[in-house]
Amino acid sequence: MNKDFLIKAQDLSFERSGRIIFSSLSLNLEEGQIIIIKGKNGSGKTSLLRCLAGFTPITSGKILWFDNEILPAFYSDKPLIAWLSHLDAIKGSLTVKENLLFFAKMWSVEPSIFNECIKKLSFEKFMNFPASWLSAGEKRRLSLLRISFCPAKVWILDEPSTFLDNDNREILIDIMNIHLKNKGAILCATHDNLKMLNSIEITL
């Protein structure tokens, strides 16, 4: 019996300015699974994630998202894929609460779930602060908070533990494992040794 893969990549190759970044790469992502992508700086981890997220065209190969060659919309009321870049997508002129409510309303997140995520990441005291006041670590936690209540089945995370201290890295791991237990799936590029459920590691 064939498995239903959330993302299926076959024989991917990617070149930039005549340089081969990666080639002949295949992977299958299924429910409850995390694929961890490792490699030195410049090895192509971010490029691979951007290709798998549909932001950057591959040079050759084939990608299926939910058994379809058409990429699902990211910014919709029912997203299938959530993206977390190594750069935090935060509007500094808005408060922390306004940044979060923009997505919570779009995704019709239940207030109880929204408040639970805020509490888990200890963000209650920051809610009325302008987002521009946050430190690098706090901005990272804000981005993780947004991901944590996103209803998307697949999370694509680029260096999610950047700027996090040990306590918040443990919270990150907990959030990711809960997503996997709830039949979600994760593609993650990281330098850290994350203790994850049902993980597969790819080194570029």
Give the location of each predicted region.
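Helix-to-loop junction immediately C-terminal to a conserved catalytic motif
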Residues: 53
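Conserved ABC transporter NBD signature motif
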Residues: 61-77
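Q-loop/switch helix immediately C-terminal to the Walker
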Residues: 87, 92-108
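Conserved ABC ATPase "signature" region
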Residues: 111-127
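Conserved ABC ATPase signature
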Residues: 130-138
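Hydrophobic anchor residue at the start of the ABC signature
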Residues: 144, 183
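Catalytic Walker B motif of ABC-type/P-loop ATPase nucleotide-binding domains
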Residues: 155-159, 164
